[in-house]
C-alpha cells in the first residue's frame, strides 16, 4: 500500500463532504431559480481543479514534514486561518479591488496570486447568480488556468519531497 494514500485519504473525506454541500447548493439554486448560464458554469471545473491540485500539493508536503516536525500541525491551523481571511469568503472581492487595484496594484496582484482566492472567485463566478454584476479580476479564467498549471508542476516537487522523506517514517513515528 503506497504511503501517499494516507494524506490523500483526507482529500477523499473532504471531497465527500464538499459533494454533499454542492448537492444542497445546487438544490437551492434550482429552488430560487437563479440558474447560472453555461458561460458562468465554465469557471466551475477550473476552480475545482485549482482547489484539488493545491489541496493535494499541501497534503503531500505538509504530511511528510509533520512526521519530522510535529509543530507543523499548528502551522497548518495558522495557514488555514490566514487562507480563509486572505480570500473573499466572508467579504466581497469588490472591497479588495477598491482598496488595492488603483493605489496598490502590486499588492492587488499579490492578492490575486493566492490560488485559494482564485478558486473562491471561480466558484462565486460560476454558482452565485447575485455575483454576476460584481467585479471580478481581469482574465479570471486565464489566472485559474495558470494557477492550476503551476500547482500541477509543484505537485511533482511535493511528491518528490514526500518520497524522499517516507523512507524514515516508521522510525520517526
Protein language model features and the residues they cover:
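Alpha-helical transmembrane segments and their short interhelical loops
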Residues: 3, 8-79, 83, 140-160
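Juxtamembrane helix-loop transition sites at the ends of transmembrane segments
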Residues: 35, 92-98, 168, 172
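Short alpha-helical basic/polar micro-motif
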Residues: 63, 117, 163
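Short cytosolic juxtamembrane segments of multi-pass membrane proteins
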Residues: 71, 163-173
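Hydrophobic alpha-helical segments
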Residues: 82, 89, 122, 126-130, ...
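Short hydrophobic, aromatic-rich alpha-helical segments embedded in or entering the lipid bilayer
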Residues: 87-141
Amino acid at each position: 500500500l503506497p504511503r501517499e494514500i494516507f494524506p490523500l485519504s483526507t482529500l477523499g473525506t473532504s471531497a465527500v463532504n464538499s459533494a454533499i454541500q454542492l448537492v444542497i447548493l445546487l438544490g437551492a439554486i434550482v429552488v430560487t431559480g437563479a440558474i447560472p448560464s453555461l458561460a458562468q458554469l465554465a469557471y466551475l471545473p477550473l476552480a475545482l481543479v485549482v482547489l484539488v491540485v493545491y489541496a493535494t500539493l499541501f497534503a503531500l508536503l505538509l504530511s511528510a514534514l509533520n512526521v519530522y516536525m510535529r509543530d507543523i500541525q499548528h502551522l497548518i491551523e495558522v495557514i488555514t486561518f490566514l487562507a480563509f481571511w486572505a480570500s473573499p469568503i466572508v467579504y466581497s472581492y469588490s472591497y479588495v479591488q477598491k482598496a488595492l487595484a488603483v493605489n496598490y496594484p502590486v499588492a492587488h496582484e499579490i492578492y490575486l496570486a493566492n490560488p485559494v482566492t482564485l478558486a473562491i472567485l471561480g466558484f462565486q463566478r460560476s454558482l452565485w447568480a447575485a455575483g454576476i454584476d460584481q467585479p471580478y479580476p481581469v482574465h479570471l479564467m486565464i489566472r485559474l488556468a495558470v494557477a492550476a498549471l503551476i500547482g500541477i508542476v509543484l505537485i511533482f516537487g511535493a511528491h518528490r519531497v514526500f518520497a524522499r522523506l517516507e523512507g524514515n517514517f516508521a522510525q520517526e513515528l
